[in-house]
Amino acid sequence: ADVFIYVGGESDAWVKTVLDGVDNPNLRVVTLMDCVELLDEETVEGMQTEKHDHDHAADDAEPDEHVWTSPRNAARICQKLADTFAAADSVHAAAYAQRCGDYVEKLNQLDAEFQDVVEHAARKTVVFADRFPLRYFADAYGLDYYAAYPGCADAAEPSAATVAFLIDKVRAEGIPVVFTIELSNGKLADTICEATGAKKLEFATCHNVTAQAFADGATYLQLMERNVQALREALN
């Protein structure tokens, strides 16, 4: 390979061993987490934290790996990739630059749509009856959030305290939408919605897609455009 791309962080700790064994001095490595300003994964009020799939103490903060969830970060990542491809394949450098510019323009438009939704919203709080791998997204648009688990948690059955907290929060703040993320079973969201009358909607983290969505050619931009509409409904 000429270029090796990976996210980085605890989940990709195995990559270093692989790269250490590669005899290719010309290999260019891009770590997505090196492309952006990192934020630590955080635990917010009401969040269940007993189970976690990373080997670190509960009190040890680690960087959130889901850097692509902010369109602004996605633009930075695209620029780094384009620069790396151009360096590895200089004959086509102009083409990489052009395509990157075109795509970043679309990402900037997406960013503007999210900003508009938040600026004209009736509230700035979202509720996720699920894991919350959207720290960068929430930070980019000044959103407050409540969720069942941190972004990298092993989402087992939620505790009664977590369920009760989220139900109370939705009722108290009149939250109209409770989010799940892709490939979630949605059971916790169903419980909260049944208790509060809120509506269950999916918010795509662009981390996973179904086999059918992949076959249909789902893209980051398509998934994020759906998120624009879902967020508009959740904040109004």
PLM features: residue spans?
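Extracytoplasmic metal-acquisition and chelation regions
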Residues: 1-236
